[in-house]
Amino acid sequence: MEKNSKIYVAGHRGMVGSAIVRELERQGYNSIITRTHKELDLTRQCEVEQFFAEEKPEYVFLAAAKVGGIVANQTALADFMYENMILEMNVIHSAWQNGCKKLEFLGSSCIYPRMAPQPMKESCLLTSELEKTNEAYALAKISGLKYCEYLNKQYGTDYISVMPTNLYGPNDNYHPTHSHVLPALIRRFHEAKEAGAKEVTCWGDGTPMREFLYVDDLANLCVFLMNNYSGDETVNAGTGKEISIKNLTELVAKVVGYEGEILWDTTKPNGTPRKLLDVSKATLLGWKYKTELEEGIRLSYQDFLSNPMRAER
């Protein structure tokens, strides 16, 4: 990408999209195109086609998505599948129709099989059954990355995909039922501290292992890959480090300053037992994350405190 290239960031108000915009601006890119949902509904094909025909972006970061935690994924299966699939197809297809030089599709590590060998390599995609608790979202994301791959094979496009591990950081979603585990814990422990609660009950038994990547580090990788990688196979984005949900919970409580008891409701689902990405491909390309987990949680908590409205989204 040149510094004056026309770059469209889809989903710029979300955690990932806003981080990509910040990173592009930090690196001196000066022709960044964004649209709010009100200005451009990505699920409406006619609007997307008109936007691409008029704006002709040269590069596209597709970070728009309908996302949520276990509760949302289990109660809105059809919504998650439909909205994600239609917006992905609309953007990717319109980019191809209008001669976009390169597109980067942002997926999720939930695309990998529930019992995939750990750490999960990019090549383990579609080798066995998906995790049922987020199957609808995973299938939609797989469709998006496969469509990019097939366009490359059939039409010679240069469309790449990135599969991040669990993300957190500025502009996260702290909704009580529609957020992911780390922001949900930040909100719960903050509210428990403010209320003087003696105990907090968390789902599951705390044994699942998870990996977390600070979103600004992901954004740095996304720009790096747009400039340095071409290929059909996706690229994993993570730290290569994992932590148990129990230890994560204790770390969040420490950062927030909650000193009460932490209990576990074992009647609730754990989700996937272990999710650690093999990040050797990104490493071999010359990239490495910068933000360690405790520091990232501190920065996230500061962001949460700076804008109380985040908790209401």
Feature-to-residue mapping (PLM):
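Conserved beta-loop-beta element that borders a ligand/cofactor-binding pocket
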Residues: G107-S108, L145-N173, P183-I186, E194-C202
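C-terminal substrate-binding subdomain of Rossmann-fold SDR/epimerase-dehydratase oxidoreductases
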Residues: A10-M15, A19-Q27, E191-R313
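Adenosine-cofactor binding site in Rossmann-like domains, unifying the SAM/SAH pocket
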Residues: E25-Q50
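SDR active-site strand-loop-helix element
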Residues: A10, R35, V60-K66, L103-S109, ...
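NAD(P)H-binding glycine-rich loop region in Rossmannoid oxidoreductase-like domains
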Residues: Q45-M85, S94-Q97
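Active-site helix of classical SDR
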Residues: A136, A140-S143
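Conserved sequence/active-site signature of Rossmann-fold short-chain dehydrogenase/reductase
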Residues: T43, I111-Y112, L167-G169, L182, ...
